[in-house]
C-alpha cells in the first residue's frame, strides 16, 4: 500500500520564529535608515565578500535565519547608498521608513493588479485620481502606477510611440 505524499506548504515551519526574524529585520532596517548619515555613502565591495557570492549553490536548505544573517553581513554594508542624503547621482528616490512599511504591506498582500474586483485595484484608481487632481489633468484622463522610474520611462516611450 502506497502512502500519499505529505502535504507540502510554503508556510514557515515555525511561525513565531519567522515573526521574530521579521521583527528583527524591521528593527535592523530602521536602524540602517536612522544611522545612514554615520556611514559612508558608498564603499567598495571587498574581494572576500564577492568570493562568498561566487560559492556553489547550497545542496541543503539553509533557513531564513541563515539567509538573513548573510544579507546583514554581505549585502547591507555594500549597498549603493541610495538612502544616504549625500547621494546626488540620479533620481531613484530615497528609501524611507513609510515606503519600507508600504512595501512590506504590499508584499504581504501580493496583489495581482491585472484585474479583478479587489480593493488594491480601487486604491490604485484613487491614487491616480488624486494625482490627476493635483496636477490639473482632466478627470477623464487615465493613468497607471508602475514599479519605478525605469518602467515609467519605458511606458512613457511606448505611449508616445503609439
Where do the protein language model's features map onto the residues?
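Conserved beta-loop-alpha segment that forms the PLP phosphate-binding cup at the N-terminus of a helix
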Residues: 124, 128-129, 140-162
